Amino acid sequence: MEQNKIEKMLGKIDFAEFGTLRDYPFLIGLQLGFSMNGGGYAVCDGGKFTVNISKECKWESQTREAAVTASLERVEEILKAAKVNYVSELVGKPVEVTLVNSAFKDFRILTEVL
């Protein structure tokens, strides 16, 4: 059995947007892009912080509300950690990005250097 390769890389947020995904307009939320190694390596969040708002999605009412609330609470946590008020102000903030098998897993704002 092959082990997952976990990497933690230092970098910065290259883009930060809140809205729908271009190719998947039923997904809405925060979308982030990161660059590491002085811009030599880039990765996106893959829609990790989005929620399916499609009418065809078979949500239980409370489950949908909980998912939307959790998504917005995550945005609030990120903004607070970065000490900003707007998503656009996240661009340029220092981060530690966690990759598993070279795919985005998670990130954290490097609050210790802000």
List each language-model region with its residue ranges.
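Short beta-rich binding modules
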Residues: 1-114
